[in-house]
Structures are given as structure tokens and as C-alpha cells.
């Protein structure tokens, strides 16, 4: 049976981890959200989130975006390539409802899977 936990080892925790992804990322994005990815040598994917107060003013909206993004990652973690991902929320992401945000994330995860197979 597949485990769908979201443990500490599946998160980017230090600034060095984020910098690693920002240096040479593969990009997949929509006008509201961008996912940067870079292959890692760990054998499993990891995720980091950046939801700036400048782009999403209200704390409950930032929390909702982060919660939905983590849940989307948690459910797809076994299909994703061994990459470090940084999800960057842009202006307008707070205007998306939960379903639209989830669908956008699914589309971006699939695009990253295709990009990883191509490289």
C-alpha cells in the first residue's frame, strides 16, 4: 500500500535548499502560480512554498493556498520525479477558488513530469 504521508523529509527546510532550486530551475507556470523544479539525488521529491504577503494580503488566504498546495503534492508525491520543487504564488492566486487552484496545480505537476522525462 502506498504511503501518503507528508513528512519532514519531503520539505525544503533551509535557505540553501531553496537557493539550489532557484539557481537552475525548470519552470512550469500559469499567470497565478509558478512551480520551479530541479532534479535532486535523494530519490524522492521535496517541496518548498513561497506565498508573499505582497501578493496575497490576507493570512487566511496565504494559509489556504499553502494547505491546498501541500495536499496536492502529498497526493501526487509517488508520481512525481525526484526533484526539489518551489511553488511561487503570484498576484491573483487568492482569486482562484479551491477547485481552480487544485486543477492548476495538477496541470503543473503533469508538466513537470513531462519535463523530467524529456531531460
UniProtKB/Swiss-Prot annotation:
Signal peptide as annotated in the record: none
GO cellular component term, pick one: ribonuclease P complex
Gene3D superfamilies according to UniProt: 3.30.230.10
Pfam families registered for this protein in UniProt: Ribonuclease_P
Catalysed reactions, semicolon-separated: Endonucleolytic cleavage of RNA, removing 5'-extranucleotides from tRNA precursor
EC numbers for this chain: 3.1.26.5
HAMAP family in the cross-refs: RNase_P (MF_00227)
Entry function: RNaseP catalyzes the removal of the 5'-leader sequence from pre-tRNA to produce the mature 5'-terminus. It can also cleave other RNA substrates such as 4.5S RNA. The protein component plays an auxiliary but essential role in vivo by binding to the 5'-leader sequence and broadening the substrate specificity of the ribozyme.
PANTHER family: RIBONUCLEASE P PROTEIN COMPONENT
Assembly information from the UniProt record: Consists of a catalytic RNA component (M1 or rnpB) and a protein subunit.
Stated family: Belongs to the RnpA family.
Protein name: Ribonuclease P protein component
Organism (species): Salmonella paratyphi A (strain AKU_12601)
